[in-house]
Design a protein with these regions (language model features):
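N-terminal intrinsically disordered/low-complexity leader segments
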Residues: 1-23, 34, 91-94, 217
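Hydrophobic/aromatic-rich alpha-helical bundle segments in the mid-to-C-terminal region
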Residues: 134-141, 145, 158-209
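Generic hydrophobic, amphipathic alpha-helix propensity
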Residues: 24-33, 50, 75-83, 151
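Helix-turn-helix
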Residues: 27, 38-70, 74
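Short secondary-structure transition hinges
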Residues: 114-153, 194
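Hydrophobic alpha-helical connector segments
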Residues: 88-121, 171-178
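Amphipathic alpha-helical linker/stalk segments
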Residues: 78-107, 138-141, 149, 157
Length: 217
């Protein structure tokens, strides 16, 4: 029985019916994400490895993606889109509970940390992998820009409530400090799991409070 299942898993999938090209494209992107998430620091990434994961012939990948970089861009666009949706949902939940700008910013911060810790492979593709940074395409910055823009907007709202506006409290600078610190939580806990870390939610809130200082609002 196990041999039959293994053989079925290795067997190339049937060709999608006409009109299902978009679905196949999405499946190729999902396969690429799985391959990238499992790669070691020095492991190569190829379209053939993606085709194998998707259980399709390699030429089928080229129908939708002319080369590796085009596929990598599609991967980043999807993953950043998911990040935008996840953080927006967390913010909406905080707002529904009566939270103001600080509570919404904190909710976004916490969910980003929890996602990274629960999905280290995906997180590394976005922020730590060696394959993606070799891409030199301005669209990569565009994919993730809404995340930073929203953080800046919420920080500005917090500052408006408090009336505190000093050069050292530039919203963009604070947003970058917050992002860098949250990234540190995720990266260090992924790469140094044997250390006795505080709970991720508590650590994220403590760092966010130290940077944003919402008590002044």
């Amino acid at each position: 029985m196990g041999a039959k299942k293994a053989a079925a898993a290795d067997r190339p999938r049937l060709r999608n019916l006409r009109g299902e090209g978009d679905r196949l494209r999405g499946e190729i992107i999902d396969a690429a994400i799985k391959v990238l998430a499992a790669l070691g620091p020095e492991d190569p990434f190829s379209l053939r490895s993606v085709a194998k994961e998707a259980k399709i012939a390699a030429p089928s990948v080229y129908i939708h993606f002319s080369d590796r970089n085009v596929l990598l861009l599609a991967v980043l666009e999807k993953l950043f889109g998911e990040q935008i949706a996840i953080r927006a949902a967390a913010e909406a939940a905080a707002a529904k509970a009566g939270g103001g700008a600080w509570e919404r910013l904190l909710a976004r911060s916490i969910v980003s940390v929890l996602f990274g810790l629960k999905n280290p492979g995906h997180y590394k593709v976005l922020f730590e992998g060696r394959v993606v940074p070799r891409l030199n395409d301005p669209r990569i910055a565009d994919f993730g820009r809404p995340l930073m823009v929203r953080s800046i907007e919420l920080i500005r709202q917090i500052q408006t409530i408090s009336g505190a506006r000093r050069v050292s409290e530039d919203p963009q600078r604070l947003a970058l400090l917050l992002w860098s610190s949250l990234h540190g939580i995720i990266s260090l806990q992924i790469n140094k799991p044997t250390l006795e870390w505080p709970k991720a939610v508590e650590l994220a809130e403590q760092i966010a409070r130290a940077i944003i200082r919402p008590e002044r609002a």
